[in-house]
Amino acid sequence: MSDSFLEELRALIDVDDGVGTRARYSSDAGLTRIPPLAVAFPRTQEQALAAFDLARARGVPLTARGGGTSCASNAIGPGLVLDFSRHMNRVLHIDPDARTATVEPGCVGSTLQAAAAAHGLRFGPDPSSQNRATIGGMVANNACGPHATAWGRTSDN
């Protein structure tokens, strides 16, 4: 099944199932190692959704990944890993009046902080990994940081 799945996936999105890539993506900041079947690199929301749909239809486990900074092995899995940090990593819009930001899931926390600061705003969470941790991962883990009592966790922002 994996060969036909990968063939279908390659028609939709950039995929790497090489030994080196699978080894690099077999761990995050945690101690567990689980080699994935393959790693895909979506460039658009449509590509990500197409990969999600195909994985679901074929029963292939899917793990979304950003910076791989989770100490709890949340960024690894045995099926398809979607790495959002390579291409989907931008701050798309800051609305200072509404105090909101629209970002792609692979946007690094410190990148959002810098963009928000230009408008006199900040994104509350400041984990020690904020120069590598992505917003998608911060949302998934409800990240916080040393100033959480003042500025809140991700779910508070």
What are these regions (language model features)?
Residues 62-64, 71, 112:
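Extended, hydrophobic alpha-helical segments in both membrane/secreted and soluble proteins
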Residues 91-94, 100-157:
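FAD-binding subdomain of flavoenzyme oxidoreductases
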Residues 56-58, 65-67, 133, 157:
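Short, basic and Ser/Thr-rich N-terminal targeting/leader segments
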Residues 1-57, 67-99, 128, 151:
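N-terminal flexible segment immediately upstream of the FAD-binding catalytic core
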Residues 42, 64, 105:
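Conserved strand-loop elements at the edges of beta-sheets that form or border functional pockets
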